[in-house]
Design a protein with these regions (language model features):
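Arg/Lys-rich, alpha-helical DNA-contact motif
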Residues: 2-18, 27, 41, 46-47, ...
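Residues within the helices of the helix-turn-helix
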Residues: 22-23, 37
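Short coil turns linking two alpha-helices in DNA-binding domains
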Residues: 32-35
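Compositionally biased, low-hydrophobicity segments enriched in charged and small polar residues
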Residues: 23-25, 30
């Protein structure tokens, strides 16, 4: 396979590749472009910009926006939903780090 085709195929598998326009992203989420702008303004996701300045979203960003949409649909204000998701992500990171430290301590604890 030629190099340029390999690169294009790699982009299809990349969760961070900005493949979705604002309109398409809104359709996928069942949301409005205004909702996407709101989660962007709240700092939850930062879409990339095309050369023409249009917002482009990745699959990872759409998953995050979908979680915000779930919270908003349950009655949570957009800003609060974004904060909740940020805190959930921070908690996941802290728990993961805690597990790694405990694993290292368990491995080295037997040596001391």
């Amino acid at each position: 396979m030629p190099a340029e085709n390999s690169s294009a195929a790699d982009s299809l598998d990349d969760d961070d590749y900005p493949a979705y326009t604002m309109g398409r992203a809104a359709d996928v989420l069942g949301a409005t472009p205004a909702f996407l702008r709101a989660v962007g303004e709240a700092g939850l996701i930062t879409p990339l910009r095309s050369e023409g300045g249009h917002r482009r979203y990745s699959r990872r960003q759409l998953r995050i926006a979908a979680r915000a949409r779930e919270l908003v649909d349950q009655g949570t204000p957009v800003e609060a939903a974004c904060r909740i998701i940020t805190l959930e992500d921070q908690l996941d990171d802290a728990l993961r780090l805690n597990r790694e430290i405990r694993r290292e301590l368990d491995e080295h604890g037997a040596d001391t």
